[in-house]
């Protein structure tokens, strides 16, 4: 297969010279893209181009990456979508329920140019444009498949939106999905037993799509329509950012994941409600995990709230009970946003019980549940504080976190980064010291950190005897 068939430039978009996808963590269903029998892969490693049908060493380029509970999806620069991992509910989009441990193109979307993808627990959603479109008019449409989506193949879905509505973003939760239109409207569908659809009521059974048109800015005022710019679905809760940089949350809040000191409906919030603790703070990014939520401010600070039993808030080991006190260090649950990282954060991703961030200095940090190495380089089952993940090179463009695995999409946009990409492919335990020394002297910080991690890994006896993912040999 010709490389341009997969990684061509079918759209006039700005592309890096090369991209890399790193996937690691829990691998029971092959969600890391390796065909081996390893149950877990604790070291991030680039997925080689040949996995996607390209020649070894090809300059692969990627647009997006997403993680579900046990499946993964990636968008190539030519608009092709690849999926792999668990498929028990048809979430891979191939019309079967057979899992795959290697990436395969979703053939039913070959007439579409996929722009972005989102993975829920057992479903997948993608935003795409028809390939015959000349690119002068945006026609971004929504495709869904998997659990509760009515098909094991991708199907075009308008829901409550009028046909030809331009879809800006989609986010999938455990059993619900929310889509954002270019006009700033949200529509939600799926299960609503905890109010995660934002309708003001709870419902039994699968619910069709409906536009969310009531947002509670103040409890003593009537709800009103708010223009939304971003949305994120957690397991049973939802968060959104308004055009004014405000955060609204709704759904299950029993673990403090909504960020409200008190809830209006027992352990739930049935309508989108503004997180007043963040008043005056402009938020640019929000991410929902299983029972926690994180937000990044315009100035690069990270706030977190919700359940912290596994360390997913990054605040250290905690014992105690629910607390409304913002700085109560004994609280197991933080139902009011607390500052975790004061500055420098660019991106955040929340998995079921772990969190990843990337910083302006190009580094990645993770924390939370770590039994499969999905959060940090540490051997421990819990990473209580932000811990560096120094196995990736290139400029971080996207972070993704799933049930027990993680993924990073990086770009090489400069000659230095391209050289780091090339050298990283050839680093082994035998030459790590030499390459690392040269990298340090020439300012190749990411490559130097990778080599240092590998040296530490060697001194540590190969990390508890697991297979070394850099050299392919047991150290």
Task: Report each predicted region and the residues it spans.
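Eukaryote-biased RCC1-like beta-propeller repeat architecture
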Residues: 1-414, 426
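Post-BTB helical module
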Residues: 412-471
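Acidic, low-complexity intrinsically disordered termini and linkers
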Residues: 474-475
């Amino acid at each position: 297969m010709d490389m341009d068939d997969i990684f061509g430039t079918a759209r006039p978009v700005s592309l890096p010279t090369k991209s890399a996808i790193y996937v690691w963590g829990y691998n029971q269903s092959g969600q890391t893209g390796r065909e081996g029998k390893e149950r877990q892969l604790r070291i991030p490693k680039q997925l080689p181009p040949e996995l996607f049908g390209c020649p070894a060493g090809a300059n692969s380029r990627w647009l997006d990456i997403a993680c579900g509970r046990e499946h993964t999806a990636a968008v190539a620069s030519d608009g092709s979508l690849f999926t792999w991992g668990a498929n028990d509910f048809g979430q891979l989009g191939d019309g079967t329920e057979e899992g795959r441990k290697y990436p395969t193109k979703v053939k039913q979307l070959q007439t579409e140019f996929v722009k972005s993808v989102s993975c829920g627990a057992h479903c997948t959603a993608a935003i795409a444009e028809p390939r015959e479109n000349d690119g002068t008019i945006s026609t971004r449409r929504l495709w869904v498949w998997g659990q509760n989506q009515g098909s094991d193949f991708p199907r075009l879905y308008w829901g409550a939106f009028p046909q030809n509505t331009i879809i800006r973003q989609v986010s999938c939760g455990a059993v619900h999905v929310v889509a954002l239109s270019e006009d700033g409207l949200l529509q939600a569908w799926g299960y609503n037993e905890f109010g995660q659809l934002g309708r003001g009521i709870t419902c039994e059974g699968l619910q069709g799509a409906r536009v969310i048109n009531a947002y509670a800015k103040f409890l003593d005022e009537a709800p009103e329509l708010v223009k939304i710019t971003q949305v994120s679905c957690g397991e049973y809760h939802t968060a959104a950012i308004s055009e004014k940089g405000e955060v609204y949350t709704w759904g299950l809040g029993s673990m403090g994941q909504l960020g409200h000191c008190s809830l209006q409906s027992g352990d739930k919030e049935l309508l989108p409600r503004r997180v007043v603790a963040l008043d005056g703070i402009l938020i640019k990014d929000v991410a929902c995990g299983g029972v926690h939520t994180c937000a990044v401010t315009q100035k690069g600070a990270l706030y977190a709230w919700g359940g912290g039993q596994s360390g997913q808030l990054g605040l250290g080991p905690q014992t105690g009970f629910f607390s409304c006190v913002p700085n109560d260090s004994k609280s197991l649950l933080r139902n009011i946003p607390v500052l975790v990282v004061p500055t420098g954060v660019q991106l955040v991703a929340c998995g079921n019980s772990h969190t990843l961030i990337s910083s302006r200095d190009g580094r990645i940090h993770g924390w939370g549940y770590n039994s499969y190495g999905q959060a940090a380089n540490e051997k421990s089952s819990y990473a209580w504080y932000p811990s560096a993940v120094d196995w990736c090179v290139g400029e971080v463009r996207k972070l993704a976190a799933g049930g027990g695995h993680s993924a990073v999409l990086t770009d090489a946009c400069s000659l230095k980064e391209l050289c780091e990409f090339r050298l990283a492919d050839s680093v082994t335990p035998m030459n790590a010291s030499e390459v690392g020394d040269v990298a340090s002297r020439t300012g190749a910080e990411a490559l130097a950190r990778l080599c240092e991690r590998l040296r530490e890994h060697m001194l540590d006896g190969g990390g508890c005897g697991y297979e070394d993912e850099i050299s392919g040999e047991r150290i």
